[in-house]
């Protein structure tokens, strides 16, 4: 038994230890000391991070020495004892198990332990056989195992081979052979990026990378420590095709350079500021929100883009790929081969980033005439950063990729206009060569084409790769404006320049030789374009129809029901435009509207002529013989200012007497509408309703349709008119042809003074009031004839007598093409129009002469009498006490009258039918410039059958007017000479449209009128054959004008007349003084009414002329009921017209 034990112990001793009785002499202390020194030198070569693990290894060696020495002493003479003590059955087995466990944990490493080191460790462990000796290694087993594991890794031969490979690849760029197809931008091991921070360093200082084992939890935790995101990089997913996950620094830099820096000279070539470049790189590393929209240094952004590609641990362009591309550059179809090499040799993320970058470089090179950066210069700047090689062939490869970008990458880049300094990358770019933008999907090898007008930033619509091959209906979307580019402050924001959308894609088959577009796609494109063209044509037709309907709505509204009065909506834009067209505006304001309205009015010209013929037929048979009552004829403006007074009588007395007389008359209500201004004496007293009324310049633009109360002076005028008409016979019988009572009218202006001695001749009442105005219903605007006689006599302005254009005319512009040219050239050139000039009203004198009436005449049919109320024109010289918008609105009355007197007679007649829309004018202007300071007019009765033309601003749609000018020079016995120039404008129509009145009472007086006219011409030593010819005609379209020795004459109204007492007022016009006069039968010069108003007030008459055409005198007008058209709804309202 003992021998067996000895054998067993000896066997264990010799199997686990190198010591034997024959080797005792060799084991000395010197050998042990050498081994200890070798062990310390080996430990000094370890990494500094593992210094704390050196102590266990040293302790193990010391224990190994102590145990070795003790075993030697014990075994020196007592073999059986040592064998028994050192032959513990558990100790070798336990140590073997520990070594096996250690080897299992280190399986993740790529190397194995050295044999010498294993033998030494086994010796050191096996020699601790004595149970009595203390073993210091037993308490520190775990640190010793870690130390042993690090020793194995350091001495591993396989890692040395890897170090050599890394040294070679860093020099030649061959490390790309270890990369995968998809470049992992988000994971880069720190031993490559940060040197020795994550790995251990050998004696040569090279970096050693660690291999990872997914089965080991310790190795996975250690691998996380060695991994981090590379800066500026974000993970690239499958949706990179939409450029949503491109690294932010590339995306923002390229967008900024595309937008602002394509024309910057030396972009990418000039060096950037190092401090600013460092600051930008730190901002991107922090990952905060960065806004480059207001950044001003383009070279720093270009330098940042180059810095990103240069500092990448792995080049984005593989070295071996560039060699293969270089080998096929000189071959045929090199572009197709290069494209195939890029698709096969690059990952998806790499291809999209390079395409995004080379798009910018190609756009820069296109504008090389401005920025001086051609293909060669750009290749020199980017080749070292993209390929990371000093091989000169890389420059040729990058240059070819930039130059042939369209055929290689399949994306179109715009040509930037040299006149601008900014190229917007967010715009839809024009297609070069008729091609459109493409995106390449590497999985199914299809190219998706985007139309240049259909580029959207809907990145979510094409996240899947299969969506690129699906086709959808083609649609055109409008190009965004250049100012609509979004700011680049969003992390994932990208310009829609290259973004794809499935709704605009068309599949294209890829072949190895060329990109063939299928016939089906071409047919679809043609069909879609045809459909779009048809849709556009239909839309244009619809828009034109709508515009025509809107234009026709104004004219067709005349034919609507005329049984009720409707007020236009507040702020009516349609009527506001009509007001502008009829007002005296500069020609540049209304040229566009005139052109449009000329086309519209010309279309309805034939219908108007038919209605005019029908109107004249009805008017000839509708002469009324009723008694003098209030007429429902709408007053265009106030007649309060026409109150006359006898010569030499105080104005205040007349004003008070008229008030007393008017208070006695019954007050009648009317549906008329007019605008009144409060009298200066009645301000604040609550008497605004009965005050006199006038208008202002600013009211020309306003449609004032408020009912007001007419002042009581109208009734007084009616009463005086009746009295004057009763006295007409007596005055006519008492006055001879040569002895006529004279009335002196003095007209005072700013620089001129005119004195007219008028000797009126009055006919009997039967000759005066025999016919009424022609008022017949028409669905279209009725023709209106107006006349104005402006007698001007200047002493200090000889230039005003040079041409008729220098005279004052109160004609206003109309939308008609026939009249707009002649009126603008002759009358509107002298108008200095001030849009917001208020009406100047005198505060001191509240009587009637302070109120102005625009130039117009209206014929009022009252019973069997037809009388005319004249209107005059004047300019105010005193400031106004009222703002144009502070006018009181009252209710009107149903009477329209004109003032008449026995000493001076004025008559004007109009054939007016008030319509809601304006019509062109029939005007006749007579301008006279006299060289004498005083004139005397002695006239005889003229024939009654003359055409009378009144002046108004109610327009008429008729052809181009005929202008006739007659000039006569006469000499009187008072040695005063005068030159009379008359211009008459009439409009010829197929049927008579002038207001020539047919009356049986005048048929017997034609011969007498001709004789009187001939006598008058003989007395003046002047023969006017035109007058005789005009008087012999019943329907004449031009007025008969007879010039006297010292004063001009006025057109004569043949039928209706009223007589107004002579009076004089102070008047001032804008250019020259004027006095209007007209008479019936007898040649009368009206007293020069001094009215304070500007020239533009003549166009106010169309403002109130908005009543519908009556169906007939005996039907709609007999009962005193006024009907008005319904106003069309307007498109928009202006706040300026919403005046209460």
Curated annotation (Swiss-Prot):
Residue ranges annotated as compositionally biased, kind Acidic residues, are: 534-549
Arranged from A to Z, the UniProt key words for this protein are: Coiled coil, Cytoplasm, GTPase activation
Q: Which residues are marked as site: Arginine finger?
A: 269
The main place the protein resides is cytoplasm
Question: Does the keyword section mention Cytoplasm?
Answer: yes
Note the SS bond partners. none
Polar residues: compositionally biased ranges: 72-82, 494-504, 572-596, 632-641, 672-684, 773-796, 823-854
Q: Which Pfam families match?
A: RhoGAP
Q: Which GO terms describe its molecular function?
A: GTPase activator activity
Subcellular location as annotated: Cytoplasm
Residues covered by region (Disordered): 1-145, 189-236, 455-504, 520-644, 661-700, 720-759, 773-927, 952-1095
* Regions of compositional bias (Basic residues) in chain numbering: 597-606
Q: Name one GO biological process term.
A: small GTPase-mediated signal transduction
Could you tell me where the Low complexity compositional bias lies?
A: 10-26, 35-71, 83-136, 193-222, 456-475, 482-493, 520-533, 550-566, 607-631, 724-759, 797-822, 891-914, 952-1058, 1065-1079
Q: Which GO terms describe its cellular component?
A: cytoplasm
Can you give the residue ranges of the Rho-GAP domain?
A: 234-409
In terms of PROSITE patterns, this protein maps to: RHOGAP
Segments forming a coiled coil: 28-55, 517-548
Q: Which InterPro entries match?
A: Rho_GTPase_activation_prot, RhoGAP_dom
Q: What does this protein do?
A: Rho GTPase-activating protein involved in the signal transduction pathway.
Protein known as: Rho GTPase-activating protein gacF
User: Whose protein is this, by species?
Assistant: Dictyostelium discoideum
- Lineage, broadest ranks: Eukaryota, Amoebozoa, Evosea, Eumycetozoa, Dictyostelia
